[in-house]
């Protein structure tokens, strides 16, 4: 089966999440992901001001990734080494993603699991209640969404 690299972006205010499963964690791949995440969030009227990442090479040393951050007009921040809780919202989302999507059931293939991601992510963003959001889904914190999109 090989490995899948799950790339995640979570909005700090709303907890709205964007996820892609990609073949690697190279700088150019991560930069492409960030650009697409920026377009996703822009579609909801969310401007990316800061990008917080861990200290992996693809984030810290990649010119492509730094260029993508600059294109968004954002500032890049790094977590303190060996302190993933610094990026707690994304780390908590990763746990939810693993428990409720990736390992929630047995898939026949990685492709089947990846194919199930859009529906799961829609449910997460639009319907899943969050304790930190008073039992409301992330989309409820996004004020620029037409009612038909909820």
Where are these regions (language model features)?
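Residue-level detector of anion-binding/catalytic polar loops
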Residues: 47, 75
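Active-site beta-loop-alpha junctions of metal-dependent nucleic acid enzymes
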Residues: 2-3, 20-44
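Buried hydrophobic side chains on well-structured beta-strands
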Residues: 15, 51-53
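Short small-residue beta-strand/loop micro-motif enriched in glycine and branched aliphatics
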Residues: 16-20, 77-79
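Histidine-centered active-site/metal-ligand motif
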Residues: 7, 76, 130
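RNase H-like two-metal-ion nuclease catalytic core shared by retroviral integrases
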Residues: 53-57, 62-69, 76-99, 111-119, ...
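Mobile-element integrase/transposase regions
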Residues: 1-10, 16, 32, 150
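C-terminal domain-tail junction helix/linker
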Residues: 70-72, 96-150
């Amino acid at each position: 089966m090989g490995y899948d690299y799950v790339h995640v972006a979570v909005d700090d205010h709303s907890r709205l999440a964007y996820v892609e499963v990609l073949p690697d964690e190279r700088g150019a791949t991560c930069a492409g992901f960030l650009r697409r995440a920026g377009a996703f969030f822009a579609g909801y009227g969310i401007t990316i001001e800061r990008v917080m990442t861990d200290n992996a090479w693809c984030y810290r040393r990649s010119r492509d990734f730094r260029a993508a951050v600059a294109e968004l007009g954002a500032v890049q921040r790094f977590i303190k080494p060996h302190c993933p809780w610094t990026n707690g919202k994304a780390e908590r989302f990763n746990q939810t993603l693993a428990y409720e999507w990736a390992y929630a059931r047995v898939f026949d293939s990685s492709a089947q699991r990846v194919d199930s991601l859009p529906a799961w992510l829609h449910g997460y963003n639009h319907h899943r209640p969050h304790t930190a959001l008073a039992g409301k889904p992330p989309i409820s914190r996004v004020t620029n969404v037409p009612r038909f999109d909820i």
